[in-house]
């Protein structure tokens, strides 16, 4: 969602308007920032990323447009994927602050800002994609950080060189090893946030790294690209985000039933290949149950290189 569209949804409260307070109490208005509301009917269908943008626009509408949108709020404005429940506060960066402070609606990050790390989107100033990815790597989970950088590389929002340069300009040294790990792990071949999160989970569980987007062909032609492929045992793991079934824009005019049949025929062709000895499917809900993912892969013959879930602590 662009800031201009978000701004068009805002209702700017008149001082102590009893009608607005009653509408809010009845659930007809959603309060997104002090003195800023949006109609519940407009709020309900918004994606989490769009809600983050709307809160950010509402917050800056009050703070003034000189504030710099950063972290998760900037990620949402760039169209980067958000993993899990996004924060309820809007992140801005203030180089004049001595320390980071989180209030009811705003998190003000204390960090140096270089002009090269800033850009304008419509009437708002926000951090560049590279700086945003670095900030996310410093403050969010590694799954979120990898999902963001994978997206940046795939969508060509930034390059790895720009990511490393943004890190070099960052004044904070604490947490640098996390940013380095994310940069080394990220790949433009991950086609969705779910694939990014699954890849991080597989690494944490100790499985060997898979080949990403491996092409498969038979006598008819190209079958498609496999999400995760372990050549040494002929195992394919396909991540199924379910959007291809539920969202009309991903079905290419096909019905849900037609998409299911198409996927079944595709999998039949994959299983018929001599190099494919097994196919495992993983969906979003499995990402919250890593032990079940590990068990499914183990049953298919994939052995861990490490035991136990590896965590990457903030340093």
Question: What are the language-model segments listed below?
Answer:
Residues 1-177, 211, 305-315:
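Short gly/ser-rich loop at a beta-strand->alpha-helix junction or flexible surface loop bordering the NTP-binding
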